[in-house]
Amino acid sequence: MTTLADLRTNYSRASLDAADVNPNPFVQFDVWFKEALSAQLPEPNTMTLATVDEAGRPSARIVLIKGVDERGFVFFTNYESRKGRELAHNPNAALLFYWIELERQVRIEGRIEKTTEEESDRYFASRPLGSRIGAWASEQSAVIESRALLEAREKEISARFGENPPRPPHWGGYRLVPSTIEFWQGRPSRLHDRLLYTRDAASASGWRIARLAP
């Protein structure tokens, strides 16, 4: 049997210093994301989304980032899914990007808001036909009796809408407006580099940067 306590990796690919990063965390994120793309990492646009239910119990899942700008980080989903219900109750959430090949993480915390109807319509129209039909066919997070019922629903929706299914009213975008963004670079002996950006209206960039102990 594998001894989990003996599994470890010593990180040594790079370092991270406040003097070397952009004062704007969105620009710095773009730098790191482009490096992840250049390294041809598998699906560098995947991130963990953490939410909390009414009882304070956390849940997490992998979702895909679909847009980043000065307003925040955008993803799309079913508003009636578990995460959608939890965000309706508590709009505070966290995102985590983990690019293991580069020994990097980006942790983002903030408040969730819905994107505009126009943004949701535009992205939905860009999706493959099967994904658009699937958004109608799946009552995400609901208990179903069998996959056969799901596939029958898919055929029904396909027959109803053909090549042009509209965006379902229960499906659309969210934007996480960050209050903090942390960049983490793995270092030897677990003495990792951690730089935390926090919103600061008094700063020229609108953010202040602090180094955190690993």
From Swiss-Prot:
One Pfam family cited in the UniProt record for this chain: PNPOx_N
Pathway: Cofactor metabolism; pyridoxal 5'-phosphate salvage; pyridoxal 5'-phosphate from pyridoxamine 5'-phosphate: step 1/1; Cofactor metabolism; pyridoxal 5'-phosphate salvage; pyridoxal 5'-phosphate from pyridoxine 5'-phosphate: step 1/1
Positions that bind FMN: 61-66, 76-77, 82-83, 105, 140-141, 184, 194
Ligand binding (substrate): R8, T9, N10, Y11, K66, Y123, R127, S131, R190, L191, H192
Keywords for this protein: Flavoprotein, FMN, Oxidoreductase, Pyridoxine biosynthesis
UniProt GO molecular function: FMN binding; pyridoxamine phosphate oxidase activity
Recorded catalytic activity of this chain's protein: pyridoxamine 5'-phosphate + O2 + H2O = pyridoxal 5'-phosphate + H2O2 + NH4(+); pyridoxine 5'-phosphate + O2 = pyridoxal 5'-phosphate + H2O2
GO BP term, example: pyridoxine biosynthetic process
Cofactor comment text: Binds 1 FMN per subunit.
Record EC number: 1.4.3.5
Function: Catalyzes the oxidation of either pyridoxine 5'-phosphate (PNP) or pyridoxamine 5'-phosphate (PMP) into pyridoxal 5'-phosphate (PLP).
PANTHER family reported for this sequence: PYRIDOXINE-5'-PHOSPHATE OXIDASE (PTHR10851:SF0), PYRIDOXINE-5-PHOSPHATE OXIDASE (PTHR10851)
Subunit organization: Homodimer.
Sequence similarity: Belongs to the pyridoxamine 5'-phosphate oxidase family.
Protein name (database record): Pyridoxine/pyridoxamine 5'-phosphate oxidase
Species the sequence originates in: Burkholderia thailandensis (strain ATCC 700388 / DSM 13276 / CCUG 48851 / CIP 106301 / E264)
